[in-house]
Amino acid sequence: MSVLIVGMSHRSAPVSLLERLSMDDSVRGETTQALLGRASLSEALIVSTCNRLEVYTVTSSFHTGVNDVVEVLHEASGVDIETLRGYLYVRYADAAAEHMLVVTSGLDSMVLGEQQIIGQVRTAYQAANEYGSVGPALHSLTQTALHTGKRVHSETAIDDAGASMVSFAVDRALVQMGLDSEAEAPLSGKTALVLGAGAMSSLAATHLGRAGISNLIMANRTLERAERLAEHSLEAGVPAEVVEYDQRASAYNRVDLVVSATGADDFTVKPEDIPEGASLMLVDLSMPRDIDDACADLPGVDLVNIERLHKASREGGSGMAPSEEEALAIVREELDSFTSEQRIRDIVPAVSALRRQAASVGSDELDRLRQRAPGISEVEWGEVEKTVRRVVDKLLHEPTVRVKELAARSGSISYDSALQELFGLESLASTAAPATTSVNASELPDAGIVAFVNAPSATQTRE
């Protein structure tokens, strides 16, 4: 049984496709249960964010597992399998572990070092726990990934590269407004309308406040949540008020920016709602989109959304920063420790089976000896039993210690399989994952099932 990841991110797919695969809590729960309904899959965890959709699962068969995950994604999203094949990537065994550590550390994010992904992975883990879909493998891997992410952010200066996609979006908006994002209070004298009251909206309000915004207007479907967000802004020293969600358009003629992060089923900002001649900077932080792209066609209206942020991120790519090198060193260290522990755990069943077989052989020989030498006294027989068992234990001690040490090292040898072959042990249900870190599409039953997109790893530089 090995961990398998089938996913899609801003590095492998267009935003329009990521939107179609985006999952709310309800869809994620249904999809998780559908995954567990497949015979090849025994655990499941889904990470769904603005920039990625990744299915983490444990499978008994690589080929069948990949096919099952792709079919479930097709059923959940309505995206045809041929389209999915062109954009999905696959990570397996040690490569899957490395990928999760890199992702959770913010090293595969659109904004290098962003911290939101740690919370998103934690939320995905908690949800999977509630669904009952997390077992020993995903529990161990996720906890290691979260620990690694914390180390990366506390032991390096990676946070300086960019706190979140929200800060990136606000900075891009400032640039497009002709303002200096490095200035002390570039938004001084400006007013912003924030739609939504969740984590993204709260972060947006915080960043707008740090940029010196003079006034904030909050609107949310649940009025009380908008009022709480306004109270927090007031406590931070930023004047804030609340408008009814249905009356949000009435505020357009008195604001300079509109930031939307609601995840609504319909557009929150439409061209027909914007007053003629209005000068507006629109920032869309939702997936699927909150703001109709057609708004950007209006005179005086500009738009920043996730798709445009992706483009800006790709165009602004640069070499690896020292903090990123330090972060990757931590990932390598934690990955080595995790995979070593996993290989040791994988070999324990084979070692136990070997000891049971040796004990059984010893017992059989003692029984035969007892029948051939019935005159041995109980005291003498007790010494014979102790001696035979002591010899068996001593003979097995060094090999079992050594095989655990060897298993802890990375390599292509499966030591539990070697023990089974050498000593004729019965095939065990728990087998070690291969140390392979890459897979070719040609190895799959249908060579076109997935496009293997190389995400950054602990041994590669970032795109």
UniProtKB/Swiss-Prot annotation:
EC number annotated for this UniProt entry: 1.2.1.70
GO BP: protoporphyrinogen IX biosynthetic process from glutamate
Keyword terms of this UniProt record: NADP, Oxidoreductase, Porphyrin biosynthesis
Known pathway: Porphyrin-containing compound metabolism; protoporphyrin-IX biosynthesis; 5-aminolevulinate from L-glutamyl-tRNA(Glu): step 1/2
Other noteworthy facts: During catalysis, the active site Cys acts as a nucleophile attacking the alpha-carbonyl group of tRNA-bound glutamate with the formation of a thioester intermediate between enzyme and glutamate, and the concomitant release of tRNA(Glu). The thioester intermediate is finally reduced by direct hydride transfer from NADPH, to form the product GSA.
NCBIfam families membership: hemA, PRK00045.1-3
Name of the protein in question: Glutamyl-tRNA reductase
Species for this entry: Corynebacterium glutamicum (strain ATCC 13032 / DSM 20300 / JCM 1318 / BCRC 11384 / CCUG 27702 / LMG 3730 / NBRC 12168 / NCIMB 10025 / NRRL B-2784 / 534)
Taxonomic classification: Bacteria, Bacillati, Actinomycetota, Actinomycetes, Mycobacteriales
